[in-house]
């Protein structure tokens, strides 16, 4: 089993691991010795990622799952449980989407879609994983939240609501599951350099909003996925055994500056 500052012998599930923040988290945990399972909606992306990870000697497996589907989530968790023989040390609820619109312009289909992936899937997978986390005798859940969960940002009312709900779920589960030796924490990214951000800044108005966010950061730059992944890994280390119910912001100092 792992020492204080590594994850040797640990099992980990990271949702949405084929790109961006999720990809960075998979690499970080695997590099620290964990056996990792991940998922994506795109088989081709997963195959390309698996080739890269295996060339680096990482122990990673993956399968396709549409996390907006309750039945697929249930089948996926059965697959993960079988792969790890019923014991899971780490669950990182990373998968999420954002739809940039004013709240009044959201359709109910938009609302249902973003809620189902960002909040319902994270909650449901956590509940499905609970017996396997408990069986490991040292479980960790990490929710990937956002500065949007605690700060009002343009065009992110519903996205921010999903992350605010996630933050409260983090605190509640930390108390409910402590008796099962499961710690629950959240990591709130600021602006992280991912393909999603690259697509967003193609819109001049969105680029202007993004530049304003970066200007409010103490470090005056975007973060890298590996910088966020390092904090996720820390929360999973045995050395972090007294940390639970916390939301840690990896935002270059944005929240320290009073938000937007």
UniProtKB/Swiss-Prot annotation:
Any single biological process term in GO: tropane alkaloid biosynthetic process
Residues engaged in binding substrate: 146
Protein EC: 1.1.1.236
CDD domains for this protein: TR_SDR_c (cd05329)
Pathway assignment: Alkaloid biosynthesis; tropane alkaloid biosynthesis
Alphabetical UniProt keywords: NADP, Oxidoreductase
Signal peptide region: none
Residue numbers annotated as active site: 159
Molecular function terms from GO: tropinone reductase activity
The reaction(s) this protein catalyses: pseudotropine + NADP(+) = tropinone + NADPH + H(+)
Chain residues that bind NADP(+): 13-37
Record-linked InterPro entries: NAD(P)-bd_dom_sf, Sc_DH/Rdtase_CS, SDR_fam, TR
Domain of life: Eukaryota
Protein family (similarity comment): Belongs to the short-chain dehydrogenases/reductases (SDR) family.
Record's function text: Catalyzes the stereospecific reduction of tropinone to pseudotropine.
Name of the protein in its database record: Tropinone reductase 2
Species this chain originates from: Hyoscyamus niger
Gene name tied to this protein: TR2
